[in-house]
């Protein structure tokens, strides 16, 4: 069987041999990858490394490759949103599993371990500001996974149907999907000191998360319905903006992934911590030790 050829219009490679957006080369990619949204957080993670091989930056995508306690790690910023995760996951997978010289799939496929460290808004009384939440399931309001074949195989369809039923989901909002973290990686990273939750990845920070400034909301009671949702003992614990695309695409590509977030605002208690950057290092240290 002839190998599939990836044309220059589909797989864009820069003149220096790096991939189009991330500006990383295949040799820059470790099997263990830590993803952060904020480019400034890359240096914070890498400050724990014993040594650094190289640093790369393009737009919001900043990367440092180094070693922590003998583990080679690539830490990379994604920017905000599932659209950026689509770029990051596809380009990381290409770096891992496509021969850039022949533009064909490698004979031996690599499985990456991907851990996203982020921030989120808590939705339950037991997720106050400062809580660490590991996303066992992620409900994607973004619709990204719906563009890929295998979407249903990578989704928890029963959970999805029950969610849409309980919150009286309006089809005009698009079709949500429910993607799961890798169970083994979830157990390793969450251990016994993180809340294992159900996360909603929203397509925006304001309206999609129920924040109302000058523009009114299409469904002002949606957040209340989300907070009251319960299925098989699981509730929606938090809002963020990337976890569903990460979990869904990683599953389809054969990689392991999990998202862990620190709660910086609790929507029920109307509390927020704007100076969270001083305290997220504790979560970073846990992930570095456990990845």
Predicted regions and their residues:
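Intrinsically disordered, low-complexity segments enriched in small residues
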Residues: 21-28, 203-206, 281-290
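Glycine-rich beta-alpha junction loops
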Residues: 121, 138, 200-207, 245, ...
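Structural signal for hydrophobic packing residues in well-ordered secondary-structure cores
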Residues: 49-53, 93-96, 100, 189-193, ...
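His/Asp/Glu-rich mid-to-C-terminal helical/loop segments that flank catalytic regions of hydrolases
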Residues: 266-291
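Active-site rim beta-loop-alpha module in soluble metabolic enzymes
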Residues: 158-231
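Metabolite-binding pocket within alpha/beta catalytic cores that recognizes anionic/polar moieties
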Residues: 2-177
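Zn-dependent metallopeptidase/amidohydrolase metal-coordination segment
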Residues: 244-275
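A short, acidic, amphipathic alpha-helical segment used as a generic capping/interface helix at domain edges
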Residues: 223-233, 239, 243-249
């Amino acid at each position: 069987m002839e190998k599939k050829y990836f044309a220059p219009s589909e797989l864009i490679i820069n003149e220096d041999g790096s991939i189009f957006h991330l500006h990383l080369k295949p040799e820059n990619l470790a099997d263990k990858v830590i993803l952060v949204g904020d480019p400034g957080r890359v240096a914070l993670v890498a400050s724990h490394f014993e040594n650094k091989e190289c640093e790369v930056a393009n737009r919001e995508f900043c990367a440092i490759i180094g070693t922590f306690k003998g583990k080679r790690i690539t830490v990379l910023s994604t920017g905000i949103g599932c659209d950026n995760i689509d770029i990051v996951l596809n380009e990381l997978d290409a770096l891992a599993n496509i021969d850039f010289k022949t533009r064909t799939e490698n004979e031996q496929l690599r499985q990456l371990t991907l851990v996203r460290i982020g921030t989120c808004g808590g939705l339950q009384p037991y997720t106050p500001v400062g809580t660490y939440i590991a996303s066992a399931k992620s409900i994607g309001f973004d619709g990204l996974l719906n563009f890929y074949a295998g979407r249903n195989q990578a989704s928890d369809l029963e959970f999805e149907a029950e969610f849409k039923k309980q919150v009286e989901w309006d089809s005009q909002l698009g079709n949500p999907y429910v993607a799961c973290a890798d169970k083994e990686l979830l157990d390793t990273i969450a251990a016994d000191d993180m809340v294992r939750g159900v996360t909603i990845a929203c397509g925006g920070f304001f309206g999609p998360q129920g924040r109302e400034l000058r523009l009114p909301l299409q469904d002002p009671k949606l957040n209340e319905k989300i907070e009251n949702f319960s299925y098989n003992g699981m509730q929606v614990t938090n809002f963020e903006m990337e976890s569903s695309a990460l979990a869904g695409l990683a599953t389809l590509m054969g990689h392991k992934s999990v998202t862990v977030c620190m709660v910086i605002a609790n929507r029920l208690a109307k509390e927020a911590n704007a100076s969270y950057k001083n305290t997220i290092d504790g979560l970073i240290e846990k992930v570095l030790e456990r990845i």
